């Protein structure tokens, strides 16, 4: 039997079982756990497109029509990196969704084929490439529409939050308040190759105005201290959410004016909600908002400005906070408010709580202290920093960091999808889900994707000079592709809405072009449902020293003086 060397095989068909890859310039290594292309019975039946390759008529390309089961697109020899595994496979796309994960080819002449290539099948060659689910950013201030392209080029394909543009309320809070504003934002969503969902304003002590917003289509309600997150508002907002199966996101009371963290916890009465700022630099009860990490009904997330903790983190935060929350540095009380939120001890503990799987999600807080294009970068920077400072996690080996990688990718993919009731559509690479997929060169993983697919069609890519004779000459930069134009935009993306809004006929009333998908199964979600990130420690925060303990363990780490995934990738 003919043989081929492991390196030569990897260079031709991509890595297989036992091969390892470094993620960008981090210290994180992944090892391929399984190879679904071996369903043919072993090596030798791989498919590959190109001159002299196998995807040709009568070879790995069958005669079958798309109606007879041939795929619209096949992504060949991809290394899938997802919460459920790190595996080599071919990925079949049909009708804008993931139709199959396995072995592609021509079943008439090849064994083990479960993904049919036909004359009507496009090929995206993923040999040597990593494929992930599109990222989900659940903390968006919709301050400017240009955020959407910035997020898409970073590998984010779903954005959830609130706002109406550069209004003062939107600078500070993620709320799209009232049915008229909600309708305008839903109509605007039709223009973008991005899945979008909007939060209404949840700060009210009576339910009528909240029901009005849910009926207009918001996927959840945001409680923000700048609008008054009182115990009465918390309880009322959760009452409405329980009745309508939408999420509640909370930014709690930094100043402890209307109650302390204990009062906020009590006001929830055990009902589920998302703690958008689980560390206080972003906002929330000072100094002990981290207490909610130990509560089973709080789904904790971080925003990216404090992630990971570096030598520059503290210095940049005061000015950011003054701008975002409409504060005046000439007013002593405003300055004290800002400084009360910025504590190096709790910021350092946040890094470790992510590594322990106690904080479940990552998000941006776009243009409101966070950077919309850096959710993915900062997630992996923290994973790298924690490996350097804390060593291997249980389940990892000297050869690989597979468990740590699965824990961290879940923070911006499947877990926000579960928390916001959209995991039936997006959040992972699984059969039946919307084909929002991101293709990366391993050397650029987490930083600069090569191709971003929306609904199974390429919407954005790193593309060279359009006047060049080939696609690769400089200047190479991100350019919208055909999936970002015309009717393809509406077909390739979803707008998430409430069940009540969908039932009320908002698609027709507002004249919406995109497919609407209702959020669901939200109110039963608990911390235990956060994949790889469901650790529920007993939290203690010293009110004088701000030192943080989880199950008695002191959580402290040094700030990073340098990080991977930074300057060397952004020379141009």
Swiss-Prot record:
Cofactor needs: Ni cation
Key words of the record: Cytoplasm, Hydrolase, Metal-binding, Nickel
Active-site residues (renumbered): 325
Entries under CDD domains matching the protein: Urease_alpha
Urease domain location: 134-572
N6-carboxylysine PTM sites in chain numbering: 222
Cofactor note as given: Binds 2 nickel ions per subunit.
Secreted found in the keyword field: no
Residue sites binding Ni(2+) 1 per the record: 139, 141, 222, 365
Record note on quaternary structure: Heterotrimer of UreA (gamma), UreB (beta) and UreC (alpha) subunits. Three heterotrimers associate to form the active enzyme.
Protein name: Urease subunit alpha
